[in-house]
Swiss-Prot record:
The keyword Signal does not apply. Ca(2+) 2 binds at D110, D112, T114, H116, E121. Residues 173-198 form a coiled coil. May act as a signaling scaffold protein that senses intracellular calcium. Can modulate ligand-induced internalization of ADORA2A and coupling efficiency of mGluR5/GRM5; for both receptors may regulate signaling activity such as promoting MAPK1/3 (ERK1/2) activation. It comes from Rattus norvegicus (Rat). It comes from the Eukaryota. Expressed in the striatum; predominantly in the caudate putamen. Expressed in hippocampus; particularly strong in the CA1 area. Expressed in the spinal dorsal horn with especially strong expression in lamina IIi; found in excitory synaptic boutons (at protein level). This is N-terminal EF-hand calcium-binding protein 2. Residues 63-98, 99-132 form the EF-hand domain. It is found in: Cytoplasm; Cell projection, Dendrite; Cell projection, Axon; Cell membrane. The keyword NADP does not apply. One of its GO terms (biological process) is positive regulation of ERK1 and ERK2 cascade.
Length: 389
């Protein structure tokens, strides 16, 4: 009897274990849990707010900043990390803004009133005024990096590639140059149009007058970097000023002193035969503009400077309104003086905006060891008509 009862108990237990739990009981428990949760007081929902970054880090630099900063570093001739008013005027003078306007711009950028503008402060000012040029300068940064990378690839192909690889690389290189040149031509056309307008403005406001003139002119950037400083050397300041119709005796004194001065500077006599272009009977201007540039060149940049100087002299000599141009190399081998005779001061200022003059200025920014000294003076045209000795 006991054994049978035990078997029945075990069979019942196994049956209960095999049967699934009653569905109604489970569903009822779930409904009771949901009802209890719905009856609880509920706090209003608040959207998740991302936690504040304790250290967001510096903001990403604006596009094109690296290009502008690199250009302005070149204006810092003494590499002290800041620009003085003199360096600022030297770099940015373009013949349109006068010295007073440039000084006002300098103090506007010099927000901390230290009488110096650091290159970052200068860069920040121009970045805020870049407009659509931000994308252009940012693209130049990328283009510069890509071109350098492509040049490395070209070298690698030409050192170890087959003829087909070299052909493809050569084709792509030429097409790249053509595309870049096409873009450059468009930009240069815009520059020339603007320069033509500004040249007309200068013609309306500038009137040539005989005598000694001291002023600042220049042409950056960026692509053309200004680098002119018009500082009259001490010997020129001692020359008498010719105003109006001087007496014949005073004119002779001026001619003698001017000839002596240039003779000392060049260690030789300048002589020109310009009678055919300077006839008083034709009402030709009685004065010429003599422009003198003195430049000290860095020894390691001498070759580049000489190549650019030769090109500048050839091109300037071909200009119709330039009567004569000559360059003299001083005894130290690193100092050069250029003399230019122009029909009028306006013609010389127009020459400052020519492509050859801008290209020469661009080279001077990189090759000169100090700012150039430049002076101009009106000289009697009759002095240039003497024959060669």
């Amino acid at each position: 009897m006991c054994e049978r009862a035990a078997r029945l108990c075990r069979a019942g237990a196994h049956r209960l274990l095999r049967e699934p739990p009653p569905q109604g009981r489970a569903l009822g428990g779930l409904l009771r849990w949901v009802g209890a949760r719905m009856g609880e007081p509920r706090a209003p929902l608040v959207p998740d707010i991302p936690a504040a970054d304790p250290d967001p880090g510096p903001a990403a630099p604006r596009g094109g900043t690296a290009v502008i900063l690199d250009i302005f570093r070149r204006a810092d001739k003494n590499d002290d990390g800041k620009l003085s008013l003199e360096e600022f005027q030297l770099f940015f003078a373009d013949g349109v803004l006068n010295e007073k306007e440039l000084e006002g711009l300098f103090h506007t950028i010099d927000s901390d009133n230290t009488n110096h503008v650091d290159t970052k402060e200068l860069c920040d000012y121009f970045v805020e005024h870049m407009g659509d040029y931000e994308d252009v300068l940012a693209s130049l940064e990328t283009l510069n990096h890509s071109v350098l990378k492509a040049m490395g690839y070209t070298k690698k192909v030409y050192e170890g590639g087959n003829n087909v690889d070299q052909f493809v690389t050569r084709f792509l290189l030429k097409e790249t140059a053509n595309q870049i040149q096409s873009l450059l031509s468009s930009v240069e056309s815009a520059v020339e149009a603007i320069e033509e307008q500004t040249s007309q403005i200068r013609q309306d406001h500038c009137k040539p007058s005989p005598g000694v003139n001291e002023s600042r002119y220049g042409g950056p950037t960026p692509p053309y970097i200004p680098n002119h400083k018009l500082v009259v050397p001490e010997p020129v300041k001692s020359l008498p000023v010719a105003i109006g119709e001087p007496k014949e005796e005073g004119l002779e004194v001026q001619i003698s002193r001017l000839a002596e001065l240039i003779g000392r500077l060049e260690s030789k006599t300048l002589s020109f035969d310009l009678q055919q272009r300077l006839s008083d009977e034709e009402g030709t201007n009685m004065y010429l503009q003599l422009v003198r540039q003195e430049m000290a060149v860095c020894p390691e940049q001498l070759g580049e400077f000489l190549d650019s100087l030769r090109q500048y002299l050839r091109s300037t000599a071909e200009e119709r309104n330039c009567f004569h141009v000559a360059a003299v190399r001083m005894a130290d081998g690193l100092t050069f003086v250029i003399y230019e005779f122009w029909e009028t001061e306006e013609e010389w200022k127009r020459h400052l905006q020519s492509p050859v003059c801008k290209a020469f200025r661009h080279v001077k920014v990189d090759t000169l060891s100090q700012p150039e000294a430049l002076s101009q003076i009106s000289v009697p045209a009759a002095w240039c008509t003497s024959g060669r000795d």
